[in-house]
Amino acid sequence: SNWFKNFLDGKSPGEGFFIEADPSNDYSQVVRPRTSPLLAEVETQRGPSHVWCTFSHDQVDLNFADPRVLIEILKVIRHYLDAGISILRLDAVAYLWKKPDHSCIHAEETHAVVRLIRLLLDQFAPGTLLITETNVPNQENLSYFGNCNEAHVVYNFSLAPLLAHALLTGTSCHLKTWMMSMPPAPPSCTYLNFTASHDGIGMRPAEGLLSDEEQHELVTTIESFGGKISRRSLPGGEEKAYELNISLFD
């Protein structure tokens, strides 16, 4: 992006727009959705620097702690609202805010930004829906409804792995237990049910709903059908299945 090119060259807009971090610090608390190194070394006009990459080294994280970044992003959203969009999706928004000695997921500052965007939509374009994409355990996912002041729509991420488990094992006990335990969506909000996506079937939403053994059996079965498994790094360095990349037809 032009912002990142300017960041490397020490120019504006872009300087200060991306998160720089000291590789000697301890980042073991940071929740990862990938196995790639968290930091990527880049050469800037000031010399070598390490930038934060939640997902991959070709996706460098913006520094929302810099007010200029937030203002620029709000301008982008305003542009789309001017163009007449009816739905705004915040992709992987759970990882938006970073701070020391924190998991860097679901930070209160992240929820504050979501509330700010919701306020912009409600005031400037009433009727425009805000949807959060948070591929995380069920209760964490529900937190993005806020107090009816964050997302209008939350993806029902737990449905996909539980449905796959039911189809492969012939028992719907976990699926039914989860369905019966789900609270109604808050007023003026709703759930979005889906069975799979271009990202695959997320496994984090099965945490607490399927046992570790059941999750392992599901992963092993998917691999036996030729499916590919995306993994994430855990704090101790071990890896765990993150997404099952296979279609229900396979």
Task: Give residue ranges: language-model regions.
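Active-site and adjacent substrate-binding regions of carbohydrate-active enzymes
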Residues: 1-250
